[in-house]
Amino acid sequence: TMDVILDVVRRYDIDGVHIDDYFYPYPIAAPEVAGNAQALDGNGKPATKELDFPDGPAWERYLAGGGKLDRPSWRRDNVNRLIEAMYKGIHKEKSWVRFGISPFGMGRPDRRPPGISGFSQYDKLYADAELWLEKGWLDYFVPQLYWPIAQTAQSYPVLLDYWISQNPQGRHMWPGLF
């Protein structure tokens, strides 16, 4: 990934590199097996089992090498190291080329404003967007705020204010609209 991105930066007169929210794939429901009893979720509905991302061999090598992180933290660390390397590598090649990310619009569940609920990019895509803003590993940030203002659980103005509050480095904040 890095080789391709830096090759594009070197070879072409580009203004920026933009990546979307696909760090690890969005969860895919596992097929149901006939005759198996299905567990219930917290609402009494059948829980959806998700297929796991097939990174087992890399995970095993990490552990064999003395790695101490749990698997979700290890996945986030992989993404974080890629984001940091992309930002630094792009700016090393051409300081004027901008790097930005458009992550899913809701942040970490443990930091969300009251009343905000829904999908967790932190837990499911292993994307720690708050960390990237904190460290300044991007030039602009485009949170995907694809919900109506009146949709309380994913309130556009509440989420926009949240992301602005997570931006101590003062990076450009360009909210994505659907």
Question: Where in the sequence are the language-model features?
Answer:
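Polysaccharide-binding and catalytic clefts of secreted carbohydrate-active enzymes
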Residues: T1-W137, Q144-W147
